[in-house]
């Protein structure tokens, strides 16, 4: 890491290692070690063979309720372990949700994570995270909370079902203004006929007031499991016909450099007891073990 913000970058880098290493969960990319060699900071972490959720979104356009809730459920399971350890991710977005070659979620990039007890980072003057998924309290007060992670998860689920995020703008200032001053519209406005319970669950995650959301990911996961037990087959199968991929690509937030292994995407496995075969049209990834290690040198982004 070089440049005027080197010390701040290095601190964030080592914080990522400490945060991720403290959490043991199959839905979080495992960090094994960190250090410095010849002036180069490095991170030793689990190698995940697969794609990120953004890649899968670009391929599919929209997701069924079944696919969406399974991915969201595994994301909440990983975040529940983080929240129990006192760690908030701060930057949940599709680029940071990896789908391994079995189709399961592994959350990555805890570089923006911070323990709840740490001082706010507002003094740095840097707005961390991605505007399309930022919770109102992060924008207004740089306040990192478990509920902020849930807001981001809810926006991500909204995008998976509808094919686009609820708030869009070419101007990031306008975008964050909407998150602070407008309620996230019901997913039912974009997905006519979707189950009312699914819409209510997303509304709970994306409530504008932090106290109106579930207390943490564990509470949200319990709520999701209750919802899943009430869904009929037709509710699970609901899917909005995907829009033209070339048009949706321009509206979706760009991949900001999160690690991605480019290959054919892997559709998620069904969450409910009735099983179904994976769709062969997208399952052609070469198989490698995901418990291999990767030594990743880290350079400061300019």
Segments predicted by a language model, with ranges:
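C-terminal lobe helix-coil module of Hanks-type protein kinase domains
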Residues: 132-235
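Activation-segment/catalytic-loop signature of the eukaryotic protein kinase fold
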Residues: 34
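Conserved short submotifs of the Hanks-type protein kinase catalytic core
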Residues: 38-52, 56
């Amino acid at each position: 890491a070089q440049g005027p913000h080197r010390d701040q970058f290095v601190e964030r880098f080592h914080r990522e290692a400490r945060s991720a290493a403290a959490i043991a969960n199959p839905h979080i990319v495992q960090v094994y070690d960190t250090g410095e060699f010849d002036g180069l900071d490095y991170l030793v972490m689990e190698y995940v063979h697969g794609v990120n959720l953004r890649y899968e979104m670009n391929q599919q356009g929209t997701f069924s309720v079944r696919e969406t809730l399974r991915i969201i459920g595994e994301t909440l399971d990983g975040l529940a372990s983080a929240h129990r350890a006192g760690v908030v991710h701060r930057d949940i977005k599709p680029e940071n949700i990896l789908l391994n070659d079995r189709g399961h979620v592994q959350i990555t990039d805890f570089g923006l994570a911070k323990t709840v007890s740490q001082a706010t980072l507002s003094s740095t003057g840097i707005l961390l995270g991605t505007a399309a998924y930022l919770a109102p309290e992060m924008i207004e007060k740089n306040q990192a909370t478990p509920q902020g992670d849930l807001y981001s998860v809810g926006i991500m689920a909204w995008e998976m079902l509808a094919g686009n995020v609820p708030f869009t703008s070419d101007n990031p200032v306008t975008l964050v203004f909407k998150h602070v001053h407008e309620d996230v519209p019901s997913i039912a406005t974009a997905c006519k006929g979707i189950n009312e319970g699914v819409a209510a669950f997303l509304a709970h995650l994306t409530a504008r007031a932090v106290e109106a959301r579930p207390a943490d990911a564990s509470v949200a996961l319990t709520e999701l499991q209750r919802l899943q037990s009430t869904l009929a087959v037709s509710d699970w199968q609901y899917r909005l016909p995907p829009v033209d991929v070339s048009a949706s690509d321009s509206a979706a937030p760009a991949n900001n450099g999160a690690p991605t292994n480019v290959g054919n995407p892997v559709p998620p496995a069904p969450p409910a007891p009735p099983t179904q075969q994976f769709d062969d049209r997208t399952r052609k990834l070469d198989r490698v073990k995901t418990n291999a290690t990767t030594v990743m040198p880290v350079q400061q982004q300019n």
